[in-house]
Amino acid sequence: MSEERSKISLRSGGKRKNRPTISAPRQISAPIPQDNGMPQPPPEATMADEPRMTRPRPPPPGGKTSDLVKKRYSTRFGNMPTDFDPSSNPMPALPDLEKYMQAQVGSPPSRGGDAGGLGPMGREPPRVDIRTLRDPNFAPEQYVAEVLGEATEDEIRDYEDALKQLKARAAADLQQNVYQNRTQFIKISKEAEKLKGEMRTLRNLMLELKTNTTALRASSNSADSSGSLGPEFSTGLSKRDRRSSITDRTALWSAQMQALYKSVEGSQKFLPNSQGRHVVQNAGPWIELDNATYKSRRSMQIFLLNDHLLIASRKKRKIDGPGADARGPMTKLVADRCWHLLDVEVVDMAGTGDSSNGRNKLADAIMVRGGGQNESFIYRTEKPEDPEKTTLILNIRKTVEELRRNLQSERDATNKAKETINYFASRDPGLLQKTELLETLSDIKDMLIEVDGKQQNLRWVESQMDELDINIALQQIEPAVARIEMLKNLASGLKNNMIAQDFISFKVDERCARLATLVVRELVNSHNDQKKTKRNVTWLVRLGFEDRAREAYLEARSEVIQKRSRQCIFQGDLHLYIWEISFVYFMVIRNTVICFQSCFPPPMMSACVKWAKEEVDAFNVILARQLSSAEEGGEVWTECVNRAKEHASMLSDVGLDFRNLVGRNVGTSTTVPGGASAGLGLS
């Protein structure tokens, strides 16, 4: 191997006849095809074949050694890959960069010279800072000096417009919040009132449940707690007559009281007959005890009524007197004491007293305490451990609770009636002048009316009035007029309920007058706009105030004529002054008649014609006053009158011909009909 290597040298060797030619380096734009002796087609043009601005390279120096070095360090590419497509681009297509460039490129400068939100001086224009304005320590002078110190007139005007918009938006938000809070307050008040009634009902039900539970417990503890009057108070009524109907119950109670009057002497003096009064329990015989020694004093009998407690004493009947019935009972009952249940207190004496003898002496006793003189009496049952005591105490408690509940219901009903009167009167002070309607308010608090097939009370009417008040306050004229029409139709349909009809009509008429005042004021302010005038007149006609609308409109037009005529200044030229005055009068009259014909109903046109004639008469007064210095029939006089008649011919466009009235009695008219002021041509 060494010998072979020694024979190979770069400087020596056999001379070759055909030396390879090494060309200069060139840029490769396509894979070099394998040298297989076959002619290859020229590669297609690619992106690399585009013309390039390359600098020409000087030809390398030739030589044997340089050719060998170039051959040694040359590179040869292998075969092409199997998936190579010579017709495809050597690199993927570039994405569209235009959409990325648009985000970076700003908007073109405006015509005013502002670029990028900067002012004309290359600074940002002043902006309204809401946080600074909300600062409690806000100093207006300092803020204006800092923000608008270097601002231009246009920037100050824009800043002022921004402040006005902010103020308008804040005012609108404040007004919306006020009426929203008022609506919520009304809704909450209604819910609170409804909840109050439900709580009152719940309380009554709980008291009734407590009473029934106590009565059931007493019935379970005692086998005989029917509370009948005994054999001597038998009314002779059968079980059928004791049904729970109101008529039978009233008859039963009346029979009980008659039996009580017959059996207890003097009881009618303490307990006069009244509706609903009846006997709850005949407690049977009792013994009155001394308060100090607890010794027996006399025999008594206790009767419990639904509102009183009657104590009757037992006395021996005299049988030796004239007319005495020997077959009757040996004793009689005489009414001794009687108290109202709410004036006394019944106390169970069990647990008090001396129990050294085995059984407590007061175990079967009760104490009745109270009355007008704050006295106390002790009563004990004749039989020890008599169940009448327990039954009497339970019945007294039950009766007292029922009595208090009935009184509370009556008091609540009275208060509710007063609240109803105060409620309606406070909302509409005008009701205080309606004495007849005010007296019936307590009767209509629960009155129901039919609205669209549903039963509604008058509080629903009040809610509609609240909505109407809100519409009027917000100057929402169309919803307010529609609601008034609905309520008027509702009131007219209540022919069988005159109280509710008068109540609704009174409230609707009051708000209707208030709304009409608002629309009339708007009509006077916008009488020059025919579209607004027609809208306002339509509202007033729907409200029933067409006469008021006509008077307000014609009066406003008369004021316009007076105002425009006073603006005509007399500067020495009588003909020019008469021309101006006549043009003002007849042009305004013509426009008024045109607007009146399109806005008001046709039957009212006669009022407009009458008004036009009055204005022509007022013009004649002015004309006569101005021509008083001119010779009647002269050139100046004739020219002025003819000019006035020429302007009066404009009324023929609206169907009026007042040319014969112009200049009539000019030489004698000196006053304005109806007291209207006459223009003197003075500034």
UniProtKB/Swiss-Prot annotation:
Q: What is its main location?
A: cytoplasm
**Keyword Acetylation recorded:** no
What are the coiled-coil residue ranges?
A: 145-213, 388-422
Q: Where in the cell is it found?
A: Cytoplasmic vesicle, Secretory vesicle
Q: Which InterPro entries match?
A: Cullin_repeat-like_dom_sf (IPR016159), Exo84 (IPR033961), Exo84_C (IPR032403), Exo84_C_1 (IPR042561), Exo84_C_2 (IPR042560), PH-like_dom_sf (IPR011993)
Q: What Pfam family is a match, any one?
A: PH_EXO84
Q: Which GO terms describe its cellular component?
A: exocyst; transport vesicle
Query: For bias kind Low complexity, which ranges apply?
Result: 219-228
Please give the biological process terms from Gene Ontology that the record holds: exocytosis; Golgi to plasma membrane transport; protein localization; protein transport
**What are the entry keywords?**
Coiled coil, Cytoplasmic vesicle, Exocytosis, Protein transport, Transport
List every stretch annotated Disordered: 1-91, 103-125, 217-242
UniProt entry tagged with the keyword NADP: no
The entry's function note states:
Involved in the secretory pathway as part of the exocyst complex which tethers secretory vesicles to the sites of exocytosis. Plays a role in both the assembly of the exocyst and the polarization of this complex to specific sites of the plasma membrane for exocytosis. Also involved in assembly of the spliceosome.
Similarity comment: Belongs to the EXO84 family.
Q: How does it assemble?
A: Component of the exocyst complex.
The UniProt entry, under PANTHER family, shows: EXOCYST COMPLEX COMPONENT 8 (PTHR21426:SF12)
Name the chain's protein.
Exocyst complex component exo84
Q: What is the native source organism of this protein?
A: Neurospora crassa (strain ATCC 24698 / 74-OR23-1A / CBS 708.71 / DSM 1257 / FGSC 987)
